[in-house]
């Protein structure tokens, strides 16, 4: 996914799930959704593991997903920085559901980039904007994310 798509997804999820929190919490969540694509350390990790262009593939990012989950488990409430962690977790999980981030993908990095920019981005623009909202998937009845941690 391209950064713009991670941002759109983050903003939609924030609108639906991060209600009644500070604007800073929303900003940190959306930043977490985007930042892994801009963090050079994530690419160095892939290079060190012998997969320089597969850094966000599920088989390489799974340990990071586990690490982020372990930071959040057993929480009674969310602290401000946890929103960034949730955003980063969302980034890796979203990437894991895209074809070029799957270990069965055999295309080149150029094919990967072309797919994300041409095909996937068009789908995200269509479904995460007007069509998604018009279909009734966006509503005000969803439980705010913070309530899951206060039960």
Which positions does each model-derived feature cover?
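N-terminal membrane-targeting hydrophobic helices
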Residues: 1-151
